[in-house]
Amino acid sequence: MEVVGKSNAHIILDSCIHESSIYFSDHEKLIKCNPYCTNVKYFMELDIFQWVFQVSDPRSHPITAVFFVRQQEESFSLDDPLDTYGQMFSAKIKNGTTFHSKAKRIRWSPVHEYPEFESDTPNTFVGKASSEICLLHQKDDRTSVYFDTDISLDFDLSFPLNLMPEGILKFMSDAIMSQIMQQATESMLCQVKSDICCSTADMAITSGGK
């Protein structure tokens, strides 16, 4: 049965877009902020990342979820009429006048051809994940971050779950997965905010000591 989860979050960081971009571009560091992540691996020759997560099924049985993604980064403009994505994104946000026009987009796209994954544990499944992180430069020199993620995971149903109507079970499983993802995303961003605050404080102390 395929389970689909979605999450979206928004946070404002007390750092400029340059500093925020450096942090969010560090794929391994960012993913490790996810409380369910147990391993991140980069395959340099393929330019793809492998994530390994430990979650639980509806009966609290452990599941190992593996994802392969490729990271892409690009800039976009909120006020350029020729920038289709920028115009679409600008229509979604409120108080657009509080932002500078130039913004950054980081995408994690699912990879369909990937290395074979061997696991010593049962209930290991390879899923698909896609994320979009948009960093907007506020005019007060802070960074507004929009983080959206979609995943899908196809796993086998164990007894007695396989006796339930699949439609009902899928609805429940999708809701649980989305709840887990939302909590994980919010936890990640809290860790990011903490790291950036600590980094800013360290820089202030260093500057003050000179």
Give the label of every model feature segment.
Residues 1-88:
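Hydrophobic ligand-binding cavity/cleft-lining segments
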Residues 16, 33, 37, 134, ...:
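Generic recognition of cysteine residues
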Residues 50-53, 91-98, 132-133, 137, ...:
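Noncatalytic linker/hinge segments flanking ATPase motor cores
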Residues 69-71, 78-81, 137, 173-179:
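Short, surface-exposed, polar/charged, turn-prone segments marking secondary-structure boundaries
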Residues 84-174:
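Beta-strand/loop substructures that line and gate deep hydrophobic ligand-binding cavities in soluble
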Residues 163-210:
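A conserved amphipathic terminal alpha-helix motif
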